[in-house]
Swiss-Prot record:
One cellular component term from this protein's GO annotations in UniProt: plasma membrane
InterPro entries: UPF0761_bac, Virul_fac_BrkB
Pfam families: Virul_fac_BrkB (PF03631)
Listed name of the protein: UPF0761 membrane protein YPK_4186
Membrane-related topology note: Multi-pass membrane protein
Claim: Endoplasmic reticulum is one of the keywords in the record: no
Source lineage: Bacteria, Pseudomonadati, Pseudomonadota, Gammaproteobacteria, Enterobacterales
Organism: Yersinia pseudotuberculosis serotype O:3 (strain YPIII)
Length: 294
């Protein structure tokens, strides 16, 4: 009787254990931490060029002139915890210096920013084991679209949010508290949609929408929890500040970027493993149904 109860308790957990083993094997085989380190290095190299190009795009659209200040605060508050103010000051100085660059230097900034997108593309296709190669023209078009349309869409969403909050009839309708709650989960929604687009569009193979949504949701939740945990760690255990002093912002930024890419790639591994697990179960069912006939 005890063994029967144990079997009943373990049987619902068996799919989870099997999926966990497949996920761990895949993460170990792909070298997730090494890939995340590569992307973290490229991200730090491309960070200033990427931010320069993004805010140059905002400057080209008058409707984003006022919202760009709020967007800066939103990005650094929600995507760079703990030391966002210090990093923001340094990056704004770098961006201000880059405005004095020549045309050749500006082209170099754009190429460096595109280098990050190319690296993300390469790493995700390694995870998906894709051998399909895009043409150079198509790849450049996709990279440029991500570089230009992504910031514009985020800026447009913030413009709409600010517009909704400015409407007087919302206060009378008593829905302002609901909008406040929506804006509170706005970073989570942006992360979820961004990861879903990343897992759906970047791989050169077809990715089931449901798998991409699940993987993106896990990554978005871990990203939000990671922000709070990282900020708590930096605040409660200020070892980096004690060791590095004023230079502590450098290892802290690198550590956060590395941790962020680990989360992004984990979401990608979950997305891929969901498809492989489903295919494995389908194959096992076919073997069971065919065995009596044999």
């Amino acid at each position: 009787m005890a063994s029967f109860r144990r079997f009943r308790l373990l049987s619902p957990l068996k799919p989870c254990v099997t999926f966990g083993r497949m996920l761990y094997t895949r993460i170990d085989k792909d070298g997730l931490t090494m890939l995340a380190g590569h992307l973290a290095y490229v991200s730090l190299l491309s960070l200033v060029p990427l931010i320069t190009v993004i805010f140059a795009l905002f400057a080209a659209f008058p409707m984003f002139a006022e919202i760009s200040i709020k967007l800066k605060a939103f990005i650094f508050a929600n995507f760079m915890p703990a030391t966002g103010d210090i990093i923001q000051n340094y990056l704004e100085q770098f961006v201000a210096n880059s405005n004095r660059m020549t045309v050749v230097g500006t082209c170099g900034l754009i190429v460096t920013a595109l280098l990050l997108i190319y690296s993300v593309d390469s790493v995700l296709n390694i995870i998906w084991r894709s051998k399909i190669q895009r043409s150079l023209v198509f790849s450049f078009a996709v990279y440029w679209m991500v570089l230009t349309l992504g910031p514009i869409l985020v800026g447009a969403s913030m413009v709409i949010s600010s517009y909704l909050l400015s409407l007087h009839w919302l206060a009378h309708a008593r829905v302002d508290s609901m909008i406040d709650e929506i804006l509170r989960v706005f970073p989570l929604l942006i992360s979820w949609v961004s990861f879903w687009l990343l897992y759906s569009v970047v791989p050169t193979v077809r990715v089931p929408a449901r798998d991409a949504l699940i993987g993106a949701l896990v990554a978005a939740l871990l990203f939000e929890l990671g922000k709070k945990g990282f900020a708590m760690y930096i605040t409660l255990f200020p070892s980096y500040q004690l060791i590095y002093g004023v230079l502590a912002v450098i290892p802290i930024l690198f550590l956060w970027v590395y941790w962020s890419w680990c989360i992004v790639l984990l979401g990608a591994e979950i997305t891929v493993t969901l498809g492989e697990y489903r295919a494995e179960r389908h194959h096992a069912k076919n073997v069971i149904t065919q065995s009596p006939e044999m």
